[in-house]
Amino acid sequence: MASESETLNPSARIMTFYPTMEEFRNFSRYIAYIESQGAHRAGLAKVVPPKEWKPRASYDDIDDLVIPAPIQQLVTGQSGLFTQYNIQKKAMTVREFRKIANSDKYCTPRYSEFEELERKYWKNLTFNPPIYGADVNGTLYEKHVDEWNIGRLRTILDLVEKESGITIEGVNTPYLYFGMWKTSFAWHTEDMDLYSINYLHFGEPKSWYSVPPEHGKRLERLAKGFFPGSAQSCEAFLRHKMTLISPLMLKKYGIPFDKVTQEAGEFMITFPYGYHAGFNHGFNCAESTNFATRRWIEYGKQAVLCSCRKDMVKISMDVFVRKFQPERYKLWKAGKDNTVIDHTLPTPEAAEFLKESELPPRAGNEEECPEEDMEGVEDGEEGDLKTSLAKHRIGTKRHRVCLEIPQEVSQSELFPKEDLSSEQYEMTECPAALAPVRPTHSSVRQVEDGLTFPDYSDSTEVKFEELKNVKLEEEDEEEEQAAAALDLSVNPASVGGRLVFSGSKKKSSSSLGSGSSRDSISSDSETSEPLSCRAQGQTGVLTVHSYAKGDGRVTVGEPCTRKKGSAARSFSERELAEVADEYMFSLEENKKSKGRRQPLSKLPRHHPLVLQECVSDDETSEQLTPEEEAEETEAWAKPLSQLWQNRPPNFEAEKEFNETMAQQAPHCAVCMIFQTYHQVEFGGFNQNCGNASDLAPQKQRTKPLIPEMCFTSTGCSTDINLSTPYLEEDGTSILVSCKKCSVRVHASCYGVPPAKASEDWMCSRCSANALEEDCCLCSLRGGALQRANDDRWVHVSCAVAILEARFVNIAERSPVDVSKIPLPRFKLKCIFCKKRRKRTAGCCVQCSHGRCPTAFHVSCAQAAGVMMQPDDWPFVVFITCFRHKIPNLERAKGALQSITAGQKVISKHKNGRFYQCEVVRLTTETFYEVNFDDGSFSDNLYPEDIVSQDCLQFGPPAEGEVVQVRWTDGQVYGAKFVASHPIQMYQVEFEDGSQLVVKRDDVYTLDEELPKRVKSRLSVASDMRFNEIFTEKEVKQEKKRQRVINSRYREDYIEPALYRAIME
């Protein structure tokens, strides 16, 4: 029968229907009809109502309707992959919204055909964020309209309200959406994979993209491949409605899709598990809600829900299974109802429209539920649920994650503009002869707000001006010390997709960056350097480009050469010309290749990795004295004492280190970079990681922690292969150990073919007998290395975490091209090893939070426990330094100290401030956890809150038992009992004699580090017998003394509010 159903709309194209008025009257029957025609296979269908039907006579009287929470949609990304962030704005009326939507800034651009408008949408998606009046509770239907009234569709979804008295806004109540040009809805399926209906009341059209339900898993795999960080945090992250993928990307990866434009006065129907996305052409108003048929029940039972937020919509399927699948109810409750969904089959209600041979198989004793029988839906067999005693309760359909961003921070600062078009960029060749211009203080402009890309959205070709009269002169040491220098800090912005320069004038002591003076260049055009994605075309040798504002200045990143220890030197005219030629040649090569991978090339002569070996005769080799060696006190660094690269090679120490790491989860030297993240976020490792000593070294299989995108991502290029050749079907990979150096890796992480995974396997370095070679990107030995440029070697983990490093052969994870790493990365100083080494070496990464300048080598950060986790494309790894660690996670990670009676602690007083107090006694209280019928939960109910039975006398209900809960608002709600939790409570007494009973989470010991929120409200009682200390409503805090800015640096001053917003 399935084969016959596949003949219905076999191409899974979006179908359009034109019902007559008679057909249009019965909504549920017409939905069954369009499914009998195969409309559900596309995941989306259009229905054009009869011309004589109108839901409302006029829309002239809605101007005063209030949009309570408009959202501004900020989009970041490039090359067809985007993330949408929603920022909540203040309430406005429809009149105000229309005025904004039709203004010159937000109005629809001119276009001749839809394809042109579609190109403009995807090209300008990240510019000029629009405002969306979404999720407005209400309807524009007139009360007398019964046909297709979105407020009362009378489908089986009404059972949710009839059985439990629960209404969920936007799910079984209508929502209004006021759109403008470029407002978007990201790729998603409906909550609980329900059907949805969308009617466009008036205004400009709305474009839709749809992926057939039978190909939905392929779209999910593609999204997880490009956004592994989001996928690890939440299995159903697409339900967050933040992911936009262009049709070109879908076509590129062979995912079937279709598109359609909805005009005013037309309906769109989405079907279960039908992924859809789209955008508005201009000012319009739409209304939508969800509904269900009997076919949806199986989808609802198997829907994968968002696990990271408790406020996501969740509907109990109990009532639906009992009513419509009674013979499968017990099996389903036991978790054994494993039905495979056939997306091609129409709903059972479509039987009357199908021939006998096309009828879908009936599931047992399912009975029809015609629309006219809905009033008596409660009257079922013996096992039917009783109607809840609870009154109506309003839930909320959580559509979008909104960010609160201070108004002081400009949007261009938070989300830099990036040109996403396919325009070609040409650079005129630099002249060989450059006239001298002496570096001065004014040749360097200070930039505190970050450099943004010039806006080239309206141009078809961009040419960089020829640099004239540019030269670097040699300066003696006195002149270098006298001149002001540019202190560069390079930060991979966590949202913007680029690195940001922030400059500061030279001070007596620099917190970051090289301690030497920098060279400066003057020119006719001011320049900056966007150091963004992997393989974008930079060789990291010389980078010259133009600011949006031209004021006649140029800065050039120079290679790290050394003069007398760590001092930098200037370029000669001939050297600069050679470097420029090499850079221009690399640009031409990259332009010809159009993103295709190129074989490893030799590093340029002035590359820092080349210069590191060119140590002058008067430079002594770096050695630590015995006194310095004995100063090691930090616990994380003690096991590494023999592994620093400034010490003599010690292969036995490396081997011992590798053996130790092999015994620790996740047992892979490459996956180790995500070790801290998994321990903190998931409370350790699952059983798949196991104990390495339990199984034979060559037989153990575990699941790698590193997503494939971390190896394949090339930043701005999306030409990547998301296949994993050495992974098993269950996602695990075999662990192999080198017989010589004992390093242990996953075959997939290191690129070991299954045929070579034997007990005699040797890593690449041992196979090449390069036992004294070290990683050129960090300062530690040990771990898994692969070959890089010029016979150098790099840690695979270092290559993964450094955005611009590139695996040439992705399957084999080698060789690694490090030539595209920008020069300023090599100038960063690692906060962990700068005290342990006399000179800077290797290449650092930085904290991903805002503009945090904290820098560290990948291997140092991993050893010190810095949290690194997979990030979303185009980034690879998201790094959180110790300064930005979440306090709650830090406190939860370590076991809380036990507290005894009589102990002095710090806790929150009833006046809202924290004081020192004494623990009087310890008690144990029992709290109940329940799941409410609307999907919400509570884990701190008192036994007396359960009103359906006397829990104080008879104890807690059985797990899964339906109970009635009296909430704090005095209403009674239906819920299911989950568990009872005995919690240790502490009765504390403050110095004023007042006592409180608090949980352990609300108590801090005197030797415990207090969170910032506690420190800010910490007070000490005075000696005045506490008069009015504990009773006053607000305790005034001592004001921080205002800092006076030196007039010399007044132009460099940042407003405190802006600084706090940036750092947050």
Swiss-Prot record:
GO cellular component: chromatin; cytosol; fibrillar center; nucleoplasm; nucleus; pericentric heterochromatin
Compositionally biased spans, kind Low complexity: 509-532
Region (Disordered): 358-384, 501-537, 616-641
Enzyme Commission number(s) of this protein: 1.14.11.66, 1.14.11.69
Cell compartment(s), UniProt: Nucleus
Effect of D939R: Impairs binding to H4K20me2, promoting partial recruitment of TP53BP1
Tissue expr: Ubiquitous.
Listed InterPro entries: EPHD (IPR034732), JmjC_dom (IPR003347), JMJD2A_ePHD (IPR047482), JmjN (IPR003349), KDM4-like_Tudor (IPR040477), Tudor (IPR002999), Tudor_KDM4A_rpt1 (IPR047479), Tudor_KDM4A_rpt2 (IPR047481)
Record-linked Pfam families: JmjC (PF02373), JmjN (PF02375), PHD_2 (PF13831), Tudor_2 (PF18104), zf-HC5HC2H_2 (PF13832)
Biased composition (Acidic residues): 366-382, 616-634
UniProt PTM: (Microbial infection) SUMOylated by human herpesvirus 8 E3 SUMO-protein ligase K-bZIP/K8 at Lys-471; thereby modulating the chromatin binding and histone demethylase activity of KDM4A.
Phosphoserine modification, residue list: S523
Cofactor(s) required, per the database record: Fe(2+)
Complex and partners: Interacts with histone deacetylase proteins HDAC1, HDAC2 and HDAC3. Interacts with RB and NCOR1. Interacts with VRK1. Interacts with FBXO22; this interaction promotes KDM4A ubiquitination. (Microbial infection) Interacts with HTLV-1 Tax protein.
Catalysed reactions listed for this entry: N(6),N(6),N(6)-trimethyl-L-lysyl(9)-[histone H3] + 2 2-oxoglutarate + 2 O2 = N(6)-methyl-L-lysyl(9)-[histone H3] + 2 formaldehyde + 2 succinate + 2 CO2; N(6),N(6),N(6)-trimethyl-L-lysyl(36)-[histone H3] + 2 2-oxoglutarate + 2 O2 = N(6)-methyl-L-lysyl(36)-[histone H3] + 2 formaldehyde + 2 succinate + 2 CO2
The protein's name: Lysine-specific demethylase 4A
Binding-site residues, Zn(2+): C234, H240, C306, C308
Binding-site residues for 2-oxoglutarate, renumbered to this chain: Y132, N198, K206, K241
Gene Ontology process terms (BP): cardiac muscle hypertrophy in response to stress; chromatin remodeling; negative regulation of autophagy; negative regulation of DNA-templated transcription; negative regulation of gene expression; regulation of gene expression
UniProt keyword Chloroplast present: no
